[in-house]
């Protein structure tokens, strides 16, 4: 084991446990660094707090992406590939570790939709919690202390060597990606590839949501991003209509209207979803609101009202036929015979069983759905 090596950083001490190979990698901005780590206390037992090998997958961070535990970027950029080193880090560098650890543990347990990595937006809301949900982490948060990190550097990928996920992009790259994703979603929608289109819209929404967390709510830039997000959500909802996921459409559109009650397209899309699940009164109320806010949409509203009327008539006819079938089934069943006294039996014969009562089949499936005209394609009055 080499003697302790001091990095040019206050409160950090490094000891190389196993030498690496080759030259020091070129850690340029956007490089992906893959590594295993073990975090320990500085007590006599060297109590293990976290160990990525126990999770079964290595961790990775992106250089220059404002990783919350900034000291890790400093530690990793001092290492060669396959090097194993131990780093002692003073309290000035470890105060945020309990919050990071909580996020890592939740991901390992499958509670977070992302994989075994951490990024800024995933940590932004952690400070709102009074407890982290883990006793050892609560203790660390109340009483920050120096920690030891044992790190094995596995791989360093240049930005051009891997496909960067949306969250890996810089703020500028995210903003540039949004119109590209939006346009690709519109193209796929027109081709009838609704699943792929919805994925593009979702990816663009994630970019904008991440950018929005960096702005002060309800100020100019925040509202600009909010408008873009709502447009994309409504495009996404049109994909959901095509996929017959009507209740999710109702959820998204209602959420938009709770915060922005003047968005005409949200009322229109919600009206169509209400119509598909036979919420006649709600659909008509939303269509009236569309006309109130945008009289020029009278033609589209009349068309939706006709479709709604036809849909409700079909449903009523289906219900009428179902009731008639149930009544006719009951009429064809033989009447139950009146009970009679059983004949005298000897003590050795068992008593006669009573005849089973006739039963009518009462269960029925949901009413059949009716076809609807497709929504205006992206790029027209309902989609930007």
From Swiss-Prot:
Assembly and oligomerization: Interacts with NUB1.
Q: Which InterPro entries match?
A: AIP/AIPL1/TTC9, PPIase_AIP, PPIase_dom_sf, TPR-like_helical_dom_sf, TPR_rpt
What is the designated name of this protein? Aryl-hydrocarbon-interacting protein-like 1
Is this entry keyworded DNA-binding? Answer: no
GO CC terms: cytoplasm; nucleus
Write out the entry's keywords from A to Z.
Cytoplasm, Nucleus, Repeat, TPR repeat
Q: Which residues form the PPIase FKBP-type domain?
A: 53-145
Q: Could you state a single Gene Ontology molecular function term? A: peptidyl-prolyl cis-trans isomerase activity
Gene3D superfamilies from the UniProt entry: 3.10.50.40, Tetratricopeptide repeat domain
Region span, Disordered: 328-384
Pfam families linked: PPIase_AIP
Please classify the protein's predominant subcellular localization into one broad category. Answer: cytoplasm
- Name its cellular compartments: Cytoplasm; Nucleus
Q: What is known about what this protein does? A: May be important in protein trafficking and/or protein folding and stabilization.
Bias kind Low complexity: ranges: 359-372
> TPR repeat ranges?
178-211, 230-263, 264-297
Does rRNA-binding count among this protein's keywords? no
């Amino acid at each position: 084991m080499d003697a302790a090596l001091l990095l040019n950083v206050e409160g950090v001490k490094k000891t190389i446990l196993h030498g690496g190979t080759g030259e020091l990698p070129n850690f340029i901005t956007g490089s992906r660094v893959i590594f295993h780590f073990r975090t320990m206390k500085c007590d006599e037992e060297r109590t293990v707090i976290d160990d990525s090998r126990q999770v079964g997958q290595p961790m990775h961070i992106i250089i220059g992406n404002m990783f919350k535990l900034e000291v890790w970027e400093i530690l990793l950029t001092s290492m060669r590939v396959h090097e194993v080193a131990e780093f002692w880090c003073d309290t000035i560098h470890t105060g945020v570790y309990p919050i990071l650890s909580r996020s890592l543990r939740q991901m390992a347990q499958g509670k977070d939709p992302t994989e075994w990595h951490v990024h800024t937006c995933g940590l932004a809301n952690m400070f709102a919690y009074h407890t982290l949900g883990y006793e050892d982490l609560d203790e660390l948060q109340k009483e920050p202390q120096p920690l030891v990190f044992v790190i094995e550097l596995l791989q360093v990928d240049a930005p051009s060597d891997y496909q960067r996920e949306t969250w890996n992009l810089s703020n500028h790259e995210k903003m540039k990606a949004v119109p590209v994703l939006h346009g690709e979603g519109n193209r796929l929608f027109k081709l009838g590839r609704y699943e792929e289109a919805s994925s593009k819209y979702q990816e663009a929404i994630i970019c904008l949501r991440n950018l929005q967390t960096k702005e002060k709510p309800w100020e100019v830039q925040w509202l600009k991003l909010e408008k873009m997000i709502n447009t994309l959500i409504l495009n996404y909802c049109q994909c959901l209509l095509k996929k017959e996921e009507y209740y999710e459409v109702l959820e998204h559109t209602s959420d938009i209207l709770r915060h922005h009650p003047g968005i005409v397209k949200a009322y229109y899309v919600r009206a169509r979803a209400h119509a598909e699940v036979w919420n006649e009164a709600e659909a008509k109320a939303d269509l009236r609101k569309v006309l109130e806010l945008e009289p020029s949409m009278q033609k589209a509203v009349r068309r939706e009202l006709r479709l709604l009327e036809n849909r409700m008539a079909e449903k009523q006819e289906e219900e009428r036929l179902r009731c008639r079938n149930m009544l006719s089934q009951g009429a064809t069943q033989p009447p139950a015979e009146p009970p009679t006294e059983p004949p005298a039996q000897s003590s050795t014969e068992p008593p006669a069983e009573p005849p089973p009562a006739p039963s009518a089949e009462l269960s029925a499936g949901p009413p059949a759905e009716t076809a609807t005209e497709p929504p205006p394609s992206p790029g027209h009055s309902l989609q930007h």
